[in-house]
Amino acid sequence: MKNIQKNIKKLKQKITNISKKFKINTQKIKLLAVSKNRSVNDIKKAILCGQNSFGENYVQESQPKIKLFNNIEWHYIGQIQSNKAHIIAKNFSWCHTITNKKTAVLLNKYRPYSLPKLNTLIQINIRDNTINIDDDIETIKQLAKTINSLDNLNLRGIMAMPYFKNTYLEQIQSYKYIHLYFDILKKKYTYIDTVSLGTSHDIQAALYSGSTLLRIGSSIFDV
């Protein structure tokens, strides 16, 4: 309990310090605890420290945790398999990893009307600096249009999975397009508010690049 409590306190202070440096409103930053491969006991400790948003990568692993802690916010941040879409749609509040229209339609189909709309993010993969912005943004626009048309999905923004970079400057260079994509979408969908970007290894670069949601695992559970 003490380690997780200490880790969360230290992490929040780090976020505050970075936010002051870049003049970011900390109220707009969401901390998501990545709980894949973490025990129920570890999750319980984090909840007792005030953490109420958790991210899972694997559908099967997530189910016992969600059933046990059904009063907190669960985010699906893993790859979506078509045969698991119904489980994601029925059990999570957020899905970060929509990459195509087929997946969006399936999630919409299986989302119960008795639940609030499923908050959704369009996943963007930034691998290098040779991407074709015009081609990519057109694909993203078409996917956003599809999501926006579906009754049971709520488009909230984008999620980025950049290629891992070692240095801060390399991270900044890799992430520079991400908020550009978000800004382009926001011109049409003014209500979107989320850029899911950043892990334990790149918090400063992520916040500098406009992240509003940090996906943190090891800095909470391992240190």
UniProtKB/Swiss-Prot annotation:
Recorded GO MF terms: pyridoxal phosphate binding
Modified residues (N6-(pyridoxal phosphate)lysine): 36
Disulfide-linked positions: none
Keywords from the named record: Pyridoxal phosphate
Highest rank taxon of the organism: Bacteria
Signal peptide stretch: none
InterPro entries: Ala_racemase_N (IPR001608), PLP-binding_barrel (IPR029066), PyrdxlP_homeostasis (IPR011078)
Pfam family, one: Ala_racemase_N
Record text on subunit structure and interactions: Monomer.
Function recorded in the entry: Pyridoxal 5'-phosphate (PLP)-binding protein, which is involved in PLP homeostasis.
Family designation: Belongs to the pyridoxal phosphate-binding protein YggS/PROSC family.
This protein's name: Pyridoxal phosphate homeostasis protein
Species whose genome carries this gene: Buchnera aphidicola subsp. Baizongia pistaciae (strain Bp)
